[in-house]
């Protein structure tokens, strides 16, 4: 009888250990895509500062200059793409 109880206890302890290991590895796998996306879309503070110095497409250009490749629309005061029909 003692051997049966010991083997049942060891089996139960093994199943609990297996559950803990599987849960830990699954939670790491769930965090991996989040970490990957955050590293892909991470932006340096220097780049953010440069981006704030000029106004991008469809941004107000009253106080800021438009970024390169855009011009300030005289009518709407937005940064737009330069075109032959725009004055």
From Swiss-Prot:
Propeptide: 25-52
UniProt keyword ATP-binding, yes or no: no
Gene Ontology CC annotation, any one: extracellular region
Record-linked PROSITE patterns: HWTX_1
Annotated protein name in UniProt: U3-theraphotoxin-Hhn1a 17
Role played: Ion channel inhibitor.
Keyword field contains Secreted: yes
Compartments in which it is found: Secreted
Domain-related comment: The presence of a 'disulfide through disulfide knot' structurally defines this protein as a knottin.
Family the UniProt entry places it in: Belongs to the neurotoxin 10 (Hwtx-1) family. 51 (Hntx-8) subfamily. Hntx-8 sub-subfamily.
Keywords: Disulfide bond, Ion channel impairing toxin, Knottin, Secreted, Signal, Toxin
UniProt note on tissues of expression: Expressed by the venom gland.
Biological source species: Cyriopagopus hainanus
An MF annotation (GO) of this entry: ion channel inhibitor activity
Cross-referenced Pfam families: Toxin_12 (PF07740)
Signal peptide location: 1-24
Disulfide bridge positions per record: 54-67, 61-72, 66-79
């Amino acid at each position: 009888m003692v051997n049966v109880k010991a083997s049942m206890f060891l089996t139960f302890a093994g199943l609990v250990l297996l559950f803990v290991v599987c849960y830990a590895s699954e939670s790491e796998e769930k965090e991996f895509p989040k970490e990957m996306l955050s590293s892909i879309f991470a932006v340096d503070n220097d780049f953010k500062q440069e981006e704030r110095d000029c106004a991008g497409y469809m941004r107000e250009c009253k106080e800021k200059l438009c970024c390169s490749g855009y011009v300030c629309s005289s009518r709407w005061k937005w940064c737009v793409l330069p075109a032959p029909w725009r004055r």
